[in-house]
């Protein structure tokens, strides 16, 4: 089981929440925990997770989850409601960068994702979630690449393409229906003409027979 799957199962599932995405990060300015609950020092892995509640009305939140060295379990550390997110900074819109900042009402963190692609995926999910669940004040996405902000546009583009294809197919069917209708009319006319010709021929045959 991957770390993200384990986090989803261990941290969010028991609270009837669904994890939408997560990104493994470390601080740009390295910071160690000087004292753990066990009384010693140690390294740890940090994940920034985005989740929503299964119960309505849906609430979205961002949670900081840690896994300490030597442990197989995960610990929920900090959590913010999505409404508290004020700014998402991508650092450099002109190149793939793993660095990013998150500004909340009462906190500010500077992170480096494990990879630029992982950050990109998380940003796309985060942007889409903000557009879907936040009706009032939405966070600013600053210095983000167009492909990150385009996640939602891609969905709309795909939807537009499908709609266009359906419209074209419908138009083609209508045109085909009209052609079939005209063909049926011609067939009916030919049928009537043939029937009239047969009746006339029969009458002539009977007349000559008499």
Swiss-Prot record:
PANTHER family: EXOCYST COMPLEX COMPONENT 1 ISOFORM X1, SEC3/SYNTAXIN-RELATED. Coiled coil: none annotated. Residues 151-210 form the v-SNARE coiled-coil homology domain. Part of a ternary complex containing SNAP25 and STX1A that can be dissociated by NAPA and NSF. Interacts with STX4A. Pfam families: Sec3-PIP2_bind, Synaptobrevin. CDD domains: PH-STXBP6, R-SNARE_STXBP6. One of its GO terms (cellular component) is cytoplasm. The keyword Heme does not apply. It comes from the Eukaryota. It is a peripheral membrane protein. It is found in: Cytoplasm; Membrane. InterPro entries: Sec3-PIP2_bind, STXBP6_PH, STXBP6_SNARE, V_SNARE_CC. The modification N-acetylserine is found at residue 2. Keywords: Acetylation, Coiled coil, Cytoplasm, Membrane. GO terms for biological process: regulation of SNARE complex assembly. Forms non-fusogenic complexes with SNAP25 and STX1A and may thereby modulate the formation of functional SNARE complexes and exocytosis. PROSITE patterns: V_SNARE. This is Syntaxin-binding protein 6.
């Amino acid at each position: 089981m991957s770390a993200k799957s384990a986090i989803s199962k261990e941290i969010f599932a028991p609270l009837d929440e669904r994890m939408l995405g997560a990104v493994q990060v470390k601080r740009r300015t390295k910071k160690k925990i000087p004292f753990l609950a066990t009384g010693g020092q140690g390294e740890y892995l940090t994940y920034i997770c985005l989740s929503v509640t299964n119960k309505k009305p849906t609430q979205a939140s961002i949670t900081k989850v840690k896994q300490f060295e030597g442990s197989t379990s995960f610990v929920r550390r900090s959590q913010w409601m999505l409404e508290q997110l004020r700014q998402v900074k991508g650092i450099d819109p002109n190149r793939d960068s793993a660095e990013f900042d998150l500004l909340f009402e009462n906190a500010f963190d500077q992170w480096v994702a494990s990879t630029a692609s992982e950050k990109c995926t998380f940003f796309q999910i985060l942007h889409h979630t903000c557009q879907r669940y936040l009706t009032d004040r939405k966070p600013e996405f600053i210095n983000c690449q167009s492909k990150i902000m385009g996640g939602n546009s891609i969905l709309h583009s795909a939807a537009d393409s499908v709609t266009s294809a359906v419209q074209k197919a419908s138009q083609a069917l209508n045109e085909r229906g009209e052609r079939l209708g005209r063909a049926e009319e011609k067939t009916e006319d030919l049928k009537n003409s043939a029937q009239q010709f047969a009746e006339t021929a029969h009458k002539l045959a009977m007349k000559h027979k008499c």
